[in-house]
């Protein structure tokens, strides 16, 4: 791991000690020996990593319906589902989701440089692909929720998932060449590299403040409060180490007139900086969300306790199950209030518990108190639930996006469904229907929490399967592969885990697996950058 310390100290040195040469290179001057050694380290690290990764996939994804990408599944396909077709549909969901995510990131760079009007055709293509993928995820969720009546019905649904994924990929592939011509990374490599170096430095300046925010959360809250971002600073630094190496190599390629190579290095660096920014943003956002939850909690508790008093007075003599529900709500609220004064606590979890208790009481009182007071109370619960749902959705989205090299179809399906319910909650809220919006927001939160749990499970399994003989990954390459920034590998393995056109070396002394590009399955591993 010596390269980690070298690269990170180089990166921080560019910020704190020396602004660097006028050409804007990240390292503040490139040593003739250091960069070749760094390139060699990256090549060896990717080779080791992809060997372990391929061994993992050989024992997982290539065994239909037993274990597919992203974690274990039942030993046999569910009744009514073809094992091979089920495995293929799950793999297609993962691959298509990766293609759409990468295309969205690349589209952001194009819009920033060329404007929304020039990028409009590609925005439309990504929107189409995202919609097709969302429908496919919805079908997968329905299969997970309710088994098909027979194999014919299961085949029809699985065929639909595969077809939707194919349509999404085809739409992205169809415009990938035009996208390359718009970005023109090879032609505009010097300007593009300079822009990426500027973005790198700007993000690097934010890391100490984000680290301080994480330390403050550790001091103030219970561990569960900051758990979703506990490792984010370390991972952000890991991505920045990889970006340092990639940007230095891109700058060298530009200076030597090797613009095609510079374009490949640049895309890798841009992907790493983007993920590092997501991780840093996530820490800052979590700190703000916890502060907001702590601020909202007293009023939320007071409102729920008022409901509890009303319920106790109005429901005397009611059926046994109703007073029982009130008693359970009373117990939860008592535990939350006690927890807030007994030491560090998790304000987000506390607010969630209060919302759940309040929603139960609101349901009990809905037919008793007047509509004006009832709707006002539901709106208050919706505001509180919206915070917890938005926080859970953001945490899951960030984790899946920055670990997509290991996250499988189950986590992604739950995340897609969480997003769908969240959008529905927002629509109903905007239509002044708090009673309709509240259960949608609560469902979104539950699905997002489940998605994060499944994604973390996938990453743990991914890391465990590397085995005790894994020599370790340096230069930030491990994080780059885990984050889906680097595709393929030295063994010619494709991004879909079956081998193919995405693998192999650059042929120019570069790392074996290249970065992803805008496009679907047929084009996202291309090397060119547009001329």
Q: Language-model segments: which ranges?
A:
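Long, charged/polar, soluble alpha-helical segments
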Residues: 1-531
């Amino acid at each position: 791991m010596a390269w980690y310390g070298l690269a990170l100290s180089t990166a921080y040195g560019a910020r704190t000690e020396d602004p660097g040469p006028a050409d804007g290179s990240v390292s503040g001057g490139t040593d003739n020996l250091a960069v070749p050694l760094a390139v060699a380290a990256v090549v060896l690290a990717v080779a080791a990593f992809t060997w372990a990764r391929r061994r993992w996939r050989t024992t997982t994804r290539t065994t239909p319906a037993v274990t597919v990408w992203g974690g274990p599944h039942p030993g046999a396909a569910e009744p009514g589902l073809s094992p091979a077709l089920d495995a293929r549909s799950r793999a297609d969901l993962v691959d298509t989701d990766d293609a759409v995510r990468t295309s969205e990131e690349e589209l952001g760079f194009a819009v920033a440089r060329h404007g929304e009007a020039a990028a409009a055709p590609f925005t439309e293509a990504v929107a189409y692909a995202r919609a097709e993928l969302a429908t496919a995820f919805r079908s997968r969720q329905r299969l997970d929720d309710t088994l098909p009546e027979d194999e014919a019905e299961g085949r029809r649904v699985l065929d639909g998932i595969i077809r939707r994924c194919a349509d999404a990929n085809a739409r992205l592939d169809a415009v990938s060449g035009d996208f390359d011509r718009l970005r023109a990374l090879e032609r505009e490599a010097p300007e593009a590299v300079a822009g990426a170096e500027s973005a790198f430095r700007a993000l690097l300046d934010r890391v100490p403040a984000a680290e301080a925010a994480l330390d403050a959360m550790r001091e103030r809250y219970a561990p569960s409060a900051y758990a979703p971002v506990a490792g984010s600073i370390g991972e952000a630094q890991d991505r920045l180490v990889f970006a340092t190496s990639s940007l230095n190599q891109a700058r060298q390629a530009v200076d030597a007139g090797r613009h095609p190579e510079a374009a490949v290095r640049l895309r890798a660096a841009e992907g790493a900086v983007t993920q590092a920014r997501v991780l840093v943003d996530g820490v800052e956002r979590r700190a703000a969300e916890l502060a907001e939850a702590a601020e909202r909690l007293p009023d939320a508790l007071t409102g729920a306790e008022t409901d509890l008093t009303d319920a106790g007075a109005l429901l005397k003599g009611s059926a046994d199950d109703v007073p029982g529900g009130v008693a359970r709500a009373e117990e939860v609220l008592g535990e939350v209030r006690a927890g807030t004064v007994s030491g560090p606590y998790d304000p987000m979890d506390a607010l969630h518990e209060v919302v759940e208790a309040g929603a139960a009481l609101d349901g009990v009182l809905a037919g008793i108190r007047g509509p004006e007071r009832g709707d006002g109370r539901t709106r208050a619960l919706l505001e509180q639930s919206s915070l917890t749902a938005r926080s859970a959705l953001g945490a899951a989205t960030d984790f899946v996006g920055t670990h997509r090299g290991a996250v499988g179809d189950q986590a992604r399906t739950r995340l897609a469904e969480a997003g769908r319910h969240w959008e529905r909650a927002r629509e109903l809220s905007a239509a002044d229907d708090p009673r309709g919006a509240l259960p949608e927001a609560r469902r979104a939160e539950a699905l997002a929490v489940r998605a994060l749990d499944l994604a973390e499970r996938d990453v743990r399994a991914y890391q465990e399967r590397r085995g005790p003989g894994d020599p370790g990954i340096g230069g930030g390459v491990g994080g780059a592969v885990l984050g889906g920034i680097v595709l393929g590998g030295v063994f010619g393995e494709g991004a879909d885990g079956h081998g193919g056109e995405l693998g192999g070396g650059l042929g120019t002394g570069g790392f074996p697996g290249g970065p992803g590009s805008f496009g679907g399955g047929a084009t996202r591993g291309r090397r060119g950058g547009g001329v």
